[in-house]
Amino acid sequence: MTASYSPSISVPLVGLVFPAITMVLSFIYIERDEIV
């Protein structure tokens, strides 16, 4: 793997995976808060 392929992988990874993790964690936090 060369450095030229790095942006095409890291940009979608940060742009899609990070918001997805944030949404899941916030959803779990809200669900726990409602249950308790």
Swiss-Prot record:
Membrane topology, as annotated, equals: Single-pass membrane protein
Write out the GO cellular component annotations.
chloroplast thylakoid membrane; photosystem I
Protein name, UniProt field: Photosystem I reaction center subunit VIII
Q: Which UniProt keywords apply?
A: Chloroplast, Membrane, Photosynthesis, Photosystem I, Plastid, Thylakoid, Transmembrane, Transmembrane helix
- Superkingdom of origin: Eukaryota
Coiled-coil annotation: which residues? none
Could you tell me which species this protein originates from?
Huperzia lucidula
Subcellular localization, as worded in the UniProt entry: Plastid, Chloroplast thylakoid membrane
What functional role does this protein have? May help in the organization of the PsaL subunit.
Q: Where are the transmembrane segments?
A: 9-29
Sorted alphabetically, which InterPro entries does this protein's record hold? PSI_PsaI, PSI_PsaI_sf
